[in-house]
């Protein structure tokens, strides 16, 4: 195994439009916009050559400027955060063998340690894409919005699904389910290849863009972690995050 430590770049996609929470990245959480927490956690991982916000909104860009957070303006036409990350990466002239980390702008609780774990496999030059998983309960596995993943003996993803996989024939409720955490890292040349591939059949069935990689024989190394997060898609999610951040801040101030 050839080992070379690459350069890492963190890009946080932050679009203004959201069907359920318009202007989501700007939502105030204890005096700061949501994206500020994501940026701080990324910086605290201490792995990145640079961390930037990729946005389609002048309002988000102005807020980032006021907080001294670097940003890259991107198109309003992007269908996915990955496409937005790619445009920003191109504008940043990121080298082909460097690693681009897509850090979701609606994950204010993402742990620096989780980001560190995400990129650890890239010391192996054969690794092209990584993502995270964590153990979940059988009840959680039944929820379609909780994406599941099954992996091979070497840790590569075999499949991602909204269905409960693997199917437990003997109804073992304590079975081994892995929930997917939507944090990704790509070598730049693999990200370039990915965004230029047409959407795949399974991707369209499941509405999971990572299946495009698997259907085109691009392996995804899955790193299991105990550092779980909480995305913000609904008002209820926001209330949970506010409470958890309040607990963190209280713990730090003690």
Swiss-Prot record:
UniProt cross-references to InterPro entries, sorted A to Z: Cytidylyl_trans, KdsB, Nucleotide-diphossugar_trans
Ubl conjugation found in the keyword field: no
Gene3D superfamilies given in the database record: Spore Coat Polysaccharide Biosynthesis Protein SpsA, Chain A
GO biological process: CMP-keto-3-deoxy-D-manno-octulosonic acid biosynthetic process; lipopolysaccharide biosynthetic process
Catalytic activity, EC: 2.7.7.38
SUPFAM superfamilies xrefs: Nucleotide-diphospho-sugar transferases
Reactions performed catalytically: 3-deoxy-alpha-D-manno-oct-2-ulosonate + CTP = CMP-3-deoxy-beta-D-manno-octulosonate + diphosphate
GO molecular function, one term: 3-deoxy-manno-octulosonate cytidylyltransferase activity
Intracellular or extracellular location(s): Cytoplasm
Coiled-coil annotated residue ranges, if any: none
Function according to Swiss-Prot or TrEMBL: Activates KDO (a required 8-carbon sugar) for incorporation into bacterial lipopolysaccharide in Gram-negative bacteria.
UniProt-listed PANTHER family: 3-DEOXY-MANNO-OCTULOSONATE CYTIDYLYLTRANSFERASE, 3-DEOXY-MANNO-OCTULOSONATE CYTIDYLYLTRANSFERASE, MITOCHONDRIAL
The name this protein goes by in its record: 3-deoxy-manno-octulosonate cytidylyltransferase
Annotated organism of origin: Lawsonia intracellularis (strain PHE/MN1-00)
Lineage, uppermost ranks: Bacteria, Pseudomonadati, Thermodesulfobacteriota, Desulfovibrionia, Desulfovibrionales
């Amino acid at each position: 195994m050839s080992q070379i430590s690459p350069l890492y770049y963190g890009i946080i996609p932050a679009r203004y439009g959201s069907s359920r929470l318009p202007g989501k990245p700007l939502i105030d959480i204890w005096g700061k916009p949501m994206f500020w927490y994501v940026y701080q956690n990324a910086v605290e991982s201490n792995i990145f050559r640079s961390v930037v916000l990729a946005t389609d909104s002048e309002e988000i860009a102005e807020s980032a400027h006021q907080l001294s957070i670097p940003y890259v303006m991107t198109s309003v036409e992007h269908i996915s955060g990955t496409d937005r990350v790619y445009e920003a990466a191109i504008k940043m002239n990121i080298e082909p063998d460097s690693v681009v980390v897509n850090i979701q702008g609606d994950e204010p609780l993402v742990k620096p340690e989780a980001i560190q774990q995400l990129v650890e496999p890239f010391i192996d030059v054969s690794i092209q894409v990584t993502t995270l998983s964590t153990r979940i309960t059988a009840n959680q596995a039944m929820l379609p919005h909780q994406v599941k993943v099954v992996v091979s003996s070497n840790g590569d993803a075999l499949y991602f699904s909204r269905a409960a996989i693997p199917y437990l024939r003997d109804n073992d409720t304590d079975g081994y389910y892995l929930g997917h955490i939507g944090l990704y890292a790509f070598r730049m040349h693999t990200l370039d290849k990915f965004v230029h591939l047409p959407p795949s059949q399974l991707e369209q069935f499941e509405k999971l863009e990572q299946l495009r990689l698997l259907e085109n024989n691009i392996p995804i190394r899955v790193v299991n972690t105990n550092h779980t997060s909480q995305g913000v898609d609904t008002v209820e999610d926001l209330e949970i995050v506010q409470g958890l951040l309040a607990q963190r801040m209280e713990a730090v101030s003690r």
